[in-house]
Amino acid sequence: MFYYGCFCSILCCCDSCHHSGCTAADIVNTYEEERLADIFYLYGELKNSRKLASVIVKARATRQISTIGDFLDIIKPLFGREREKKELAKVFQALRIEVNREMEALKEMLYAATEALKPGGRLVVITYHSLEDRMVKNIMKTGNIEGKAEKDFFGNVQTPFRLVNNKVIVPDETEIERNPRSRSAKLRIAEKIEK
């Protein structure tokens, strides 16, 4: 199920992470408890993020967490057997997102695309988890990541985009059968409009 090797490099999926020097091992061994909890809550959407962070901080006080095996031994008891695999996937997702700075990169790309597109140009984005999808949906509907609608004098929402599809596009059963990784994919399309 999981690779029990070095914890330092197993979660790094891109070269840019190596330039910043941040590894999953750095995160679990050095981040403050509150920051760890925030990462697990925001990026992994884990309800027990505070407890998870607390257990990690207590464990690392006695010795450094250096392998995935060490890490799993510490956190597995927090999850029930029936949900263990899903919950562990969320933990590793949160660490991967933090290591690779995925949310920051997506945010920068969305704002840059909003500025670069000319009226009539289309922004087409495929997301694979709810955090990404929320950001994309917000920028397409309101023009900002937070989803705060700016209104004109008459109360009309000011947005740089018009949604091309009212509903998000998801893979059908045939696509999922052919490509199981597509099951969580969501495609959103918006067209830049005149201001």
Model-predicted segments: where are they?
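S-adenosyl-L-methionine-dependent methyltransferase catalytic core, i.e., the SAM/SAH-binding region
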Residues: 1-195
